[in-house]
């Protein structure tokens, strides 16, 4: 009898399979369609190209000086606000730092909160969070007729949550990590097909990194791939790196570590993703090895510091390119991944992937197989590497700036913050330019030995940070840059200095504009071609998120979170004075509090401040008796 039932069930599943696949295809096609509409901003980076580029040009370089605030919304929280809100079909979805509240706003009357989710979390998560209590955003899934449209979020205390996009009710909730060992969640979820992709945080506490795919409809785990360890844990495809065997193939997830050090070896991924439907690969980077003290973990420490291309359906890695073997500086390689299609120097159209890394190098790979196309310095002041050998993919180190125990490294450029960090940059496909926010910060590094204790910081270095050579080291200003980069020529069309690091990222538009926020609390617009500053506005607090844009009822809006914090703001947020505190950030940003203070919210601009409240009746109370 049981055999009969099993057979019938199997036949039923086969019969349902086409319908299930059809619903998946429908939902994915709808998400792609929504991402192409400039009314919406449905995922981090706007679309699967992850390019933060909009075709909108109602706001352009001839009229940008007319931008005025249209409306604002306070989240009620004061820690750093990273990422950007989502806009879908006339609603804005706003997220916050811990405790990771979520708000749905009606764009016809944004003062009206449609629903709000305020989770109760384990407060112990705060103690194991590195570098403020930030969160990088939300994801949207459009539903399939049976499952409602969802807003997906991560919580610092390890949970992944799916909320009904219309009501805010919890549809499912799963545990992704374990705060007892220091594993938290700060990453924005990423929806691909019928899966939501989730990374991990906690390398500073010796957390072993992994990437997980969950069924977006149920929260069931589909696959999990680790950054270190045996091949079966890494999910390496049979043809892994087959076209670039010199990058390394099987067995290296353990062989490049001493003993079982890979079990506490880091490699978490808390940054940004991209996806190519043509290759069906998800692109992302793994972070720094643990501990920071390189003496304690001999070897290349694969596959930390790696750009992976993983199959979205199986999780199998088709390629992996390790940018910084045996990282000595905490150059966690999780930064933004931006696909493009461009002609190379030989005139051949290539499917490319560009990634500005913490280590001071901006990489461009062939995204079909991971082959390295170019590797150029983010700034000519990078000194840890002399160059990158394009044949081997290996960086050529300058030993003077290494961090070994018998050598006190001074004036190391970039600092552990990198010349680029979590900011989400933009790519203008018409100009073939990447607009990148830069941290112009260097450091002194003093390593020390320490034991591993689960749930405690596992770093092993004291850092002192200060402005890079182009900044003002006496006054601790000039810690940032904004640059326009061509990946094919390896040249910079323009670059401009900023008082502080450009931490949040950029937005490029067809209006010939580049927008970005600054730590000292400005939203700025520059000319895409020249870098000339065309407009700026002082916002209530420093910005560590990136701007986004959308249209509603024919009006273009530009929005950005305000709320200083994150790694550069830890001194201000937690009132720290020791320059080596905050893993060295407090000293570098000692002047930040002179220019901004804490806040938390979103501010939305339009030409002449046009918006829903031009009608004075919008938002007004109406008596039921009238």
Curated annotation (Swiss-Prot):
Q: Which domain of life is it from?
A: Bacteria
Q: Which reaction does it catalyse?
A: 2 Fe(III)-[cytochrome cL] + a primary alcohol = 2 Fe(II)-[cytochrome cL] + an aldehyde + 2 H(+)
The cellular component terms of Gene Ontology attached to this UniProt record, alphabetical and capped at eight, are: outer membrane-bounded periplasmic space; plasma membrane
Q: How does it sit in the membrane?
A: Peripheral membrane protein
Q: Which cysteines are joined by disulfide bonds?
A: 130-131, 413-442
Keywords assigned: Calcium, Cell inner membrane, Cell membrane, Disulfide bond, Membrane, Metal-binding, Methanol utilization, Oxidoreductase, PQQ, Signal
Binding residue positions for Ca(2+)? 204, 288
Q: Please give the Pfam families that the UniProt record associates with this protein.
A: PQQ
Where is the secretion signal located?
Answer: 1-27
Catalytic residues (positions): 330 (proton acceptor)
Q: Which SMART domains match?
A: PQQ (SM00564)
Where does the protein end up?
Cell inner membrane
What are the GO BP annotations of this UniProt entry? methanol metabolic process
For activity, the cofactor(s) needed are: pyrroloquinoline quinone; Ca(2+)
Q: What is an example of a GO molecular function annotated in this UniProt entry?
A: alcohol dehydrogenase (cytochrome c(L)) activity
Note accompanying the cofactor annotation: Binds 1 PQQ group per subunit. PQQ is inserted between disulfide Cys-130-Cys-131 and the indole ring of Trp-270.
EC number annotated for this UniProt entry: 1.1.2.7
CDD domains noted in UniProt: PQQ_MDH
**What is the top EC class of this enzyme, as a single word?**
oxidoreductase
Quaternary context: Heterotetramer composed of 2 alpha and 2 beta subunits.
Function field: Catalyzes the oxidation of primary alcohols including methanol.
Protein family per UniProt? Belongs to the bacterial PQQ dehydrogenase family.
This chain's protein is named Methanol dehydrogenase [cytochrome c] subunit 1
Source species: Methylobacterium organophilum
